[in-house]
């Protein structure tokens, strides 16, 4: 994804 959070980073959200 575009954010910096661990979950979004990996593309889970």
Curated annotation (Swiss-Prot):
EC number: 1.16.3.1
Main localization category: plastid
Entry comment describing in which tissues the protein is expressed: Leaves.
GO biological process: intracellular iron ion homeostasis
GO MF entries: ferroxidase activity; metal ion binding
Cellular component annotations (GO), alphabetically ordered: chloroplast inner membrane
Keywords: Chloroplast, Iron, Iron storage, Membrane, Metal-binding, Oxidoreductase, Plastid, Plastid inner membrane
Known catalytic reactions: 4 Fe(2+) + O2 + 4 H(+) = 4 Fe(3+) + 2 H2O
Subcellular location: Plastid, Chloroplast inner membrane
Assembly mode: Oligomer of 24 subunits. There are two types of subunits: L (light) chain and H (heavy) chain. The major chain can be light or heavy, depending on the species and tissue type. The functional molecule forms a roughly spherical shell with a diameter of 12 nm and contains a central cavity into which the insoluble mineral iron core is deposited.
Function: Stores iron in a soluble, non-toxic, readily available form. Important for iron homeostasis. Has ferroxidase activity. Iron is taken up in the ferrous form and deposited as ferric hydroxides after oxidation.
Additional remark text: On the 2D-gel the determined pI of this protein is: 4.74, its MW is: 25.7 kDa.
Family, as annotated: Belongs to the ferritin family.
The name this protein goes by in its record: Ferritin-2, chloroplastic
């Amino acid at each position: 994804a575009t954010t910096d959070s661990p979950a979004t980073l990996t593309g889970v959200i």
